[in-house]
């Protein structure tokens, strides 16, 4: 209900702009399928733990999460948050290996994302998020590997711009029932 009240306040204020909210990776506290009708577009925060032993399982799980986000409205979604390098809250905050930024980002696009957005653009100067990755790190130069990889990804996405808004026909389905999961 809270989200609906926020949307109504925006609509009452005269805006017709699309509304969304950040869904989180495999979060079980809410049934996201019940939010979809009230949102104009689905968006989510993707922070997988890459570079661990079961890396292929991480890739599968990310693909499943992307597909689930697309399924809520049957249309492209937005990758609202991702880290171009490390995260500050995982047990071990590993810097992504060279090329992983592009691989993970293009995986999202291949599964129906119309965006690759980052938290954060400039690395925070204080609190715990000063350790969270960013496009522009504390050094601030354009010659860092992460900055250069983001630029390279931007060039690649520009070449793929015709894919934006496209929707692949579904050929299979996996039923996910949050309320049944809660009951278990």
Annotate each PLM feature:
Residues 21-22:
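Short His-Asn-centered micro-motif
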Residues 4, 12-16, 25, 36-40, ...:
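Carbohydrate-binding surfaces of carbohydrate-active enzymes
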Residues 30-31:
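Short, glycine/polar-rich helix-capping loops at beta-to-alpha or helix-loop-helix junctions
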Residues 1:
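Active-site-proximal, well-structured secondary-structure segments within enzyme catalytic domains
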